[in-house]
Amino acid sequence: MAVPDVQLSRRHQNILERFLSACQADERVVASFLIGSNAKGKADEHSDLDLYLVTTDAAFDDFVATRESFARLLGEPLFMEDFGHPNILFLIFADGSEVEIYYTSESQSGGFFNAPYKVLMDKKHSSEKIALSESDVDQAQQTEKLRRLIHWFWHNLSHFITALERDQLWWARGQLEELRAGCVGLARLSNNFSDTEVEEEVYFKIEDAMPVDSLAPLRETFCPMEREAMLEAASVILNSYKELARPLAQAHEIAYPEKLEQIMVERLEKISEDR
């Protein structure tokens, strides 16, 4: 079986053939698709294989209950997790292939297709009704993410200062990483306010999401786990934060925490003077 207009590696081709065979033989499955970078024509040798299937509404709960058995029809995975996501399995096979299987029911499938896809199997010709549309990002949710990034920064800075006051360098280093990640999240929102990867996986495919040259000042903050070096890094991160957070807060009508900034900057300056 070959997918039109798509070049796959041999190992991905083998998995795709097993996936299609499993879908064809399973009466619960009515359609299956190739999605992700392979469907977009942007895959490279390091890309994973993103697959998507649709079940009947009546069979969906049964499929969810037996999804691991279905996944094993593709091969014996060494890793199989959902990370708490209700409609996806993450798989790693012995040959190193990484596969993601998304699944949904017929009545819920319409909202998924906000990116290119390739039809693998369609028992009911339902794909003819699919209209490719851009995904709508909830701007209110994005504004709330921004508010959290702006305010949580000071909470993390407080922990960083407390850790150094107690000479707990491991804790301080961890908080420094949180501070930097917060700045990266702000930079992503500054570049594209509809960017959803600004909190939990802020570094995820960041080179594809924004010009990373704008993050150059933060490079020097990857420093040794030493008090002096971390204080200097915190100062750089703080400056980057203020350059990003203030205009974003103004643009999206979020009250900037002026008094909180004053208090925390004074604490940071004091501990810097005491070094």
Give the location of each predicted region.
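Conserved nucleotidyltransferase catalytic core and NTase-mimicking acidic/glycine-rich helix/loop elements
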Residues: 137-275
